[in-house]
Structures are given as structure tokens and as C-alpha cells.
Amino acid sequence: NARHFRERMSSAGFDLRPGNHPIVPVMLYDAKLAQRFASELLEEGVYVIGFFYPVVPQGQARIRTQISAAHSIAQIDRAVDAFIRVGKRLGVI
């Protein structure tokens, strides 16, 4: 599931931290953007957390996602589609 999420998000143009684990950081680098992105995703029905300083170093703000084996491919695709809509709206992709 995490691989599917990573592949779709990368193909859409998102900057992801490398790794092979269920926690997938989506890098946005700006704290206010991360907060707004998380808020707009919630409006889309997708709950994520924006991490920014002091939780992560300044300039390294991100959206923290955690993909589970319990998520269906349809749920993951729905989340990615929401990321894409918000990402385009906010000029991230």
C-alpha cells in the first residue's frame, strides 16, 4: 500500500522523503503552506497532520501520512486524488 501511495504521489509531482516504510512525508518546506494544505485536505475528507518547526527543522515542513495495510487501494487512490486537487489549487504541483 505504501508503495502504491508513493508511486502515485511521485508521478503526480509531489516531493516525498525516500524510504520504504508506512510513514510517508510529503515535503512542502513552508510551515504556513503545510498548515493550509492539511486544512484543505481535511475539507476533502482526508485527515493528515502538517509538521513544521519545532517538530522538524525550519524549512522542512511536511505533511505526515501513515499508510496502513488496512487501507484499501480505493481509499489510497481517493486520498491521492485529494492531494492532487489540493496540490494544484495551492500551486504545489
Could you say what each language-model-derived stretch is?
Residues E43-Y47, P54-I93:
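PLP-dependent enzyme catalytic core of the Aspartate aminotransferase-like
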Residues A2-G45, V55, G59-Q60, I67-A69:
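Conserved PLP-binding catalytic core of the aspartate aminotransferase-like
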